[in-house]
Regions:
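Long, non-transmembrane cytosolic or organellar matrix-exposed soluble domains/tails
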Residues: 69, 73, 78-194
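Soluble accessory domains appended to multi-pass membrane transport proteins
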Residues: 1-94
Length: 194
């Protein structure tokens, strides 16, 4: 706040504009205070990419071999395979039937990759929450949400970090045999009609 009178309150906004509001709004409405973000260890990123549900599948041995070659996934794939193998053996699971027992999926491995990728970035604050999670499936696919805090708080560099992360995510999705869900566009309709 920059000025408080009986009839008005002048507030400097995050973008340096000044807003005049009546005092009763301070009690009746909510306001976003950017000071907490400035004083904290980072600025939050909370964005999703919708994955096409038709591209989710159990991992084949060939897929797992490919994923083991990814530096950020090698340990995860090996440890998870050991846990799954032990579970299936302990419970006498007949693995000749695909739905029996536990198996890794390309979506689960992708989620593990994204988590490891975020934690490897120098601009992500490792002391604050950093997670990748699936949200409720919708008619637009499965939202895969990246939730983390960027250590850079200034707007332009923050947007750059966020864009770099999502550029990378969009580029590597095909490596996991997954597809992004995207509503049909004019080009899609032209393909169908021709």
């Amino acid at each position: 706040m920059i000025e408080v009178t009986l009839n008005t309150v002048k507030v400097r906004n995050w973008d340096n504009t000044i807003t005049t509001i009546p005092p009763y709004l301070l009690v009746s409405d909510s306001f976003q205070n950017w000071r907490g973000m400035r004083e904290s260890g980072g600025r939050r990123v909370k964005r999703s990419i919708n994955i096409d549900m038709n591209s989710v599948r159990f991992c084949t041995p060939e897929m797992l071999d490919k994923y083991r070659k990814i530096r950020l996934l090698k340990d995860y794939v090996e440890q998870t395979e050991a846990v799954i193998e032990e579970y299936n053996k302990k419970h006498h699971i007949d693995n000749s039937v695909l739905v029996n027992g536990r198996r890794q999926t390309n979506l689960g491995v992708f989620r593990a990759y994204l988590t490891a990728y975020l934690k490897s970035l120098p601009d992500v604050n490792k002391e604050l929450t950093c997670m990748v999670r699936q949200l409720q499936p919708t008619d637009h696919g499965i939202p895969m949400e990246l939730y983390f805090f960027c250590a850079i708080k200034d707007w332009v560099p923050y947007e750059g970090v966020q864009a770099d992360v999502f550029d990378h995510v969009l580029a590597i999705i095909p490596e996991f045999d997954l597809q992004v869900f995207q509503s049909p566009s004019g080009r899609d309709f032209q393909r169908v009609l021709s």
